[in-house]
Amino acid sequence: MSAAAASSAAGDSAKQPLLHHQRGNPPHVASVSSPSLPSAPPGALAGGRRFPGGLDVPNLKKRGGGTRSWIRVEAATASVQTLEVDKATMMRRCELPARDLRLLDPLFVYPSTILGRERAIVVNLEQIRCVITADEVLLLNSLDSYVLQYAAELQRRLLQRAEGDELPFEFRALELALEAACSFLDAQAAELEIEAYPLLDELTSKISTLNLERVRRLKSRLVALTRRVQKVRDEIEQLMDDDGDMAEMYLSEKKLRTEASFYGDQSMLGYNSVGDGTSFSAPVSPVSSPTESRKLEKAFSLCRSRHDSVKSSDNTATEHIQELEMLLEAYFVVIDSTLNKLTSLKEYIDDTEDFINIQLDNVRNQLIQFELLLTTATFVVAIFGVVAGIFGMNFETSVFSIQNAFQWVLIITGVIGAFIFCGFLWFFKYKRLMPL
């Protein structure tokens, strides 16, 4: 036994260096250097990865997930404050996915969008990018005057709330966002109209390269603005046509339902705990049966009241859907009017282009007619020159013996050329190639 143990220990001691040699890095491999591979920069070894184009991945991650400045407008007190919140905190606070918050990122260019979620409304309308909840509005802090005006105007309206105004807070915030976006787009359309019509009138009277270049830039701006207005119009129209999306935006009612359901569940849990306590403490006696019946009636009345509250909340939600639809319809009319302005301006530009093309075609036709006349005259003169050249050759003929014979040849050739030219003109008129 001792010999076997000794041999086993010797075998294990012999295997240990081999295992250590297999697991660790071989010393001769570590000493080999490859001259063809460049050495990695310190940032790539320690901090993170750097791509050949100079792209710093850690900095991009910090930039994407860093804190942002938000303007918070509270519904209850109408107070305005600035918050520094990162993206993950905002997602947990409003229960929004990352793709919804990406719509509000100023680094990305997204079309106008209005999304109704469980606890928030995501609004991306031109410069106004915000998250509307039942209790607050979180607006991306920006130096844009429209953003600051939106926050100030919302605070003013919350402080000066009219007595007959029954709209929930989220609808009022959404209304102000629609008003700001529609006003901004309408102002840009009006500015474009003021600049476009005089320029187009000048172009019809004087066609020049400078005027054509100005009209080209104007048309590019018009197409871009029309696309933005059309997207806002389509977004409002899509909301108006879908009752489910409008009901999803009624955040105050959903909050009341959640609170009522929570308190109702708490009451039912309290009743069950009391019932369980009486059943375990003592057997049910005939004296305690009225108490149990009263508790049962109370539970039934609680369920009935919850059912009635849900039913009344459904009726209230239907009324508010109609109010939201009327609100959206009002701004749909405004944005549709702006779109009609831009459409009329585009039609005016198209008419001006058609008029210019007609003028250019007319000038081109005149040039072609002049070239045709010039070619015909050149042909007649060439005939006259051929005759004169023939008689100018050095050969003997009886014509040269007659006095003034060469002059008569020239006169006759000219008359024949004139008749040929008149014949061509008559042919052009007959074929309607030239208005003569």
UniProtKB/Swiss-Prot annotation:
Q: Which GO terms describe its cellular component?
A: membrane
Subcellular location per the Swiss-Prot or TrEMBL entry:
Membrane
Is Cytoplasm tagged as a keyword? no
Membrane topology is: Multi-pass membrane protein
UniProt feature, compositional bias: Low complexity? 1-14, 29-54
Please tell me where this protein is predominantly located.
Answer: membrane
Swiss-Prot/TrEMBL keywords: Coiled coil, Ion transport, Magnesium, Membrane, Transmembrane, Transmembrane helix, Transport
Give positions of region: Disordered: 1-60
Q: Name one Pfam family in it.
A: MRS2-like
Biological role? Magnesium transporter that may mediate the influx of magnesium.
**Which protein are we looking at?**
Magnesium transporter MRS2-B
Give the source species: Oryza sativa subsp. japonica
| Source lineage | Eukaryota, Viridiplantae, Streptophyta, Embryophyta, Tracheophyta
